[in-house]
Amino acid sequence: LNATIGIARTLADEDVGKSLAEIQNTLFDVGADLCVPESSESESSSLRVVPEQVSALESTIDTFTERLEPLKSFVLPGGSPAAAALHQARTVCRRSEIEVLRLAETQAVNQQVLVYLNRLSDLLFVLARAANDDGHDDMLWVPGQGAA
């Protein structure tokens, strides 16, 4: 996930890139949190994902959403290279969330990790839309257009 976001970051503008850099740093906290089961009493407890990190994502979602036109249809992945890379990062994030859910079936997992990954995928969608707001249009789904 972090590497995929890194690729998107190389293609993104400065605003989006700054947000992605912060996310990449926090993803190391996510990894550290997952390495030490919730039930462990460890010095690593300072590396747990906390609600404030989720709140920071939500604040960034709000900031970028305010700049965008409201959606009138589902968005197809694509548009600018940065947007396409962000859509790809979003799908990797969703897969990561599913894997953490599977892990939670067998061991204690900090629920904030799951909340963080869920909100991160939403933010990556918003950032993909923002990346297309620089002169590229979002590619909108047209029902039935793909029918032969």
Describe each PLM feature range.
Residues 2-148:
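Phosphate/pyrophosphate-binding loop motifs in nucleotide- or prenyl diphosphate-using proteins
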